[in-house]
Amino acid sequence: MLGLQIFTLLSIPTLLYTYEIEPLERTSTPPEKEFGYWCTYANHCRFCWDCQDGICRNKAFKNHSPILENDYIANCSIYRRNDFCIYHITSIKPHKTYRTECPQHINHERHEADIRKWQKLLTYGFYLAGCILAVNYIRKRSLQTVMYLLVFLVISFLLSQLMLYGELEDKKHKIGSIPPKRELEHWCTHGKYCNFCWDCQNGICKNKAFKNHPPIGENDFIRYDCWTTHLPNKCSYEKIYKHFDTHIMECSQPTHFKWYDNLMKKQDIM
């Protein structure tokens, strides 16, 4: 009974941390409170912009400089399930579909602060459980029982720490400021405002990854130095502008870029 109580105590922070996100039915306009999320990935979607007299201002990021209205701003529809989010670009035929992982879109600094908070709670829980074990030993003098429970407590504590700190280890793998040329199409689908996606000359910027992308005027939209991280099971890019902000997605995304998956498989074989 005592072991069950200790396990419950240690599990509460982890259970709270792994909450599910409410589903969202298909719509062309996300809830206002979610603009920051959708307009980070789908920042060329029309619902992110307020355009008047040819000048467009970003609804989600008020400090974003205005840009001229052009073909970069497209009509989109979105929907969400518990484990993934999808947005469709409907103003282009054939329609293009992109998938992102909803629970992992989170400000890196805030994410790390949350992990530190739960780590402290787990530590306090560990101390409390140790006190309970000590009291139990003093009362019943059952050293063997206390040792079994102590081992169980330590294992549970370490497993909880591994679960919480897993994502903080990402920076130790394959980090670079400029991705390989063969991967530009992949990275520039998500991090399209990263400066490695654009070739700017005389105030006009052309997209390096998508040759059919119309040129746009150089502006603050293209101002981020980005760092990319490529892991075996997921990729992330980090914006370096005032505050670090990390976004994570599966390396195989977007799913319609089959050439990227095939290229990676060929490299593994070689």
UniProtKB/Swiss-Prot annotation:
<comment type="similarity">
    <text>Belongs to the asfivirus MGF 110 family.</text>
</comment>
<feature type="repeat" description="A">
    <location>
        <begin position="27"/>
        <end position="146"/>
    </location>
</feature>
<keyword id="KW-0325">Glycoprotein</keyword>
<feature type="signal peptide">
    <location>
        <begin position="1"/>
        <end position="26"/>
    </location>
</feature>
<feature type="topological domain" description="Extracellular">
    <location>
        <begin position="27"/>
        <end position="117"/>
    </location>
</feature>
<dbReference type="InterPro" id="IPR004848">
    <property type="entry name" value="ASFV_fam_110"/>
</dbReference>
<keyword id="KW-0244">Early protein</keyword>
<keyword id="KW-0472">Membrane</keyword>
<protein>
    <recommendedName>
        <fullName>Protein MGF 110-1L</fullName>
    </recommendedName>
</protein>
<comment type="function">
    <text>Plays a role in virus cell tropism, and may be required for efficient virus replication in macrophages.</text>
</comment>
<dbReference type="GO" id="GO:0016020">
    <property type="term" value="C:membrane"/>
</dbReference>
<feature type="glycosylation site" description="N-linked (GlcNAc...) asparagine; by host">
    <location>
        <position position="75"/>
    </location>
</feature>
<keyword id="KW-1133">Transmembrane helix</keyword>
<feature type="transmembrane region" description="Helical">
    <location>
        <begin position="118"/>
        <end position="138"/>
    </location>
</feature>
<feature type="transmembrane region" description="Helical">
    <location>
        <begin position="146"/>
        <end position="166"/>
    </location>
</feature>
<feature type="topological domain" description="Extracellular">
    <location>
        <begin position="167"/>
        <end position="270"/>
    </location>
</feature>
<feature type="repeat" description="B">
    <location>
        <begin position="147"/>
        <end position="270"/>
    </location>
</feature>
<dbReference type="Pfam" id="PF01639">
    <property type="entry name" value="v110"/>
</dbReference>
<keyword id="KW-0812">Transmembrane</keyword>
<keyword id="KW-0677">Repeat</keyword>
<keyword id="KW-0732">Signal</keyword>
<feature type="topological domain" description="Cytoplasmic">
    <location>
        <begin position="139"/>
        <end position="145"/>
    </location>
</feature>
